[in-house]
Amino acid sequence: MSITKDQILEAFAAMSVMEVVELIEAMEEKFGVSAAAAVVSGGAEAAVVEEQTEFNVVLTAHGDNKVAVIKAIRGATGLGLKEAKAMSEAAPVAVKEGVSKEEAEALKKELTEAGASVEIK
């Protein structure tokens, strides 16, 4: 006659905590296993993602109002008229690199209002 799972559970329920601990230790010895919880490592997926602190403002197209875009580029970079015009015509091009998020957002807004297409990377 074999013992059912329900009978085993009833036997566990009737045991004291010390008796359960002794039973677990005996099972570990008999079967050569450990009852310790397995530690799962997250690997690369669980690595802390570092928040980006420096951004590049990239002009992707100067749009229809090229003059306003050139003025915005000059104001933001301090370039001369010729250099700012060349930059606007060389799109896609980084207008400013390594700037803070706030500065990048402000420059994007300024260039977008002038009619340019801008990305922050």
From Swiss-Prot:
GO cellular component: cytosolic large ribosomal subunit
Keyword Ribosomal protein attached: yes
InterPro entries named among the record's database cross-references: Ribosomal_bL12, Ribosomal_bL12_C, Ribosomal_bL12_C/ClpS-like, Ribosomal_bL12_oligo, Ribosomal_bL12_oligo_N_sf
Source superkingdom: Bacteria
Pfam families: Ribosomal_L12 (PF00542), Ribosomal_L12_N (PF16320)
Gene Ontology BP term (one): translation
Keyword vocabulary terms for this entry: Ribonucleoprotein, Ribosomal protein
Keyword Ribonucleoprotein carried by entry: yes
Single GO MF descriptor: structural constituent of ribosome
Function, in words: Forms part of the ribosomal stalk which helps the ribosome interact with GTP-bound translation factors. Is thus essential for accurate translation.
Similarity comment text for this entry: Belongs to the bacterial ribosomal protein bL12 family.
Quaternary structure and interacting proteins, as annotated: Homodimer. Part of the ribosomal stalk of the 50S ribosomal subunit. Forms a multimeric L10(L12)X complex, where L10 forms an elongated spine to which 2 to 4 L12 dimers bind in a sequential fashion. Binds GTP-bound translation factors.
Matching HAMAP family: Ribosomal_bL12 (MF_00368)
NCBIfam families named among the record's database cross-references: L12
Protein name: Large ribosomal subunit protein bL12
